Amino acid sequence: RKVYTFSSDDILPFAKEPNMVDLFDAAPKLMMSSTPRWEDKSVWFNKVNEDYGSFTAIPEAQRKVDELIKGKKTEMEKIAVLTHWVADNIRYSGISMGKGEGFTLHNLKMNYTDRCGVCKDIAGTLIAFLRMAGFEAYPAMTMAGSRVESIPADHFNHCVAVVKLASGTYMPLDPTWVPFCRELWSSAEQQQNYLPGVPEGSDLCLTPVSAPENHYVRIHADNRLDEKGTLRGQFTIT
């Protein structure tokens, strides 16, 4: 048996600053892991949920998927309609399930019946929906609001999904953060680390920057400044 001891003296409370980055990105912290590579943790996360049957299809959910994708021609149309249905209809509700909670996602039968759960239940429902629609989809772990360090430790606080596109690339999806929103991945999660639980294993990934054209709020200002220094005008927001 090996025993590791870490100690530090005279530690003062961390002084926060206005608009600073997340505390986990600035304050001292200790990370430990018995996993040598991210790929190993990715495979483990995949196997834990596949062995449990987290995404096993059920007839009533299959009928809903068929209804939703009817008439949808492209893969993005199908992915979008499934993501938004799950986001809008599986309510976020954090209820303790006792011991055994963690990296195993609850199965579709439970989630579709209860229509509520935490992020892993919402993501798990979407993964099952995508698979019933013919897509290859898997769970992924992320740390919402702060970075994930390079050491492959368990420093995640949020569960999302990835779907494989026809191009062969994986696209991250977050149904928890996009209810009644046009996005498929919240722009608040740009350049955020995530780890897909895929059978071939994956290194730590980084979400892309959301293009400006995805955020088309335009402000037109028509103002006049008179000789007395008074500014009058109007703003039009579209």
Regions found by a protein language model. Name each.
Residues 1, 72, 115-118, 137:
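A conserved hydrophobic secondary-structure block that centers on an alpha-helix together
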Residues 1-100, 227, 231-238:
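Secretory-pathway-linked proteins and extracytosolic
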Residues 58, 75, 79, 112, ...:
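Active-site-proximal structural scaffolding
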Residues 62-63, 98-109, 143-145:
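Short, conserved phosphate-binding/catalytic loop or strand-edge motifs used
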Residues 69, 93-99, 144-149, 156, ...:
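Active-site-adjacent structural elements in folded domains
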Residues 77-81, 87, 93, 99, ...:
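Active-site-proximal cofactor/substrate-binding loop regions of enzyme domains
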Residues 120-210:
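Hydrophobic/aromatic-rich core segments of domains that either
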Residues 199-238:
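Long hydrophobic segments that form regular secondary structure
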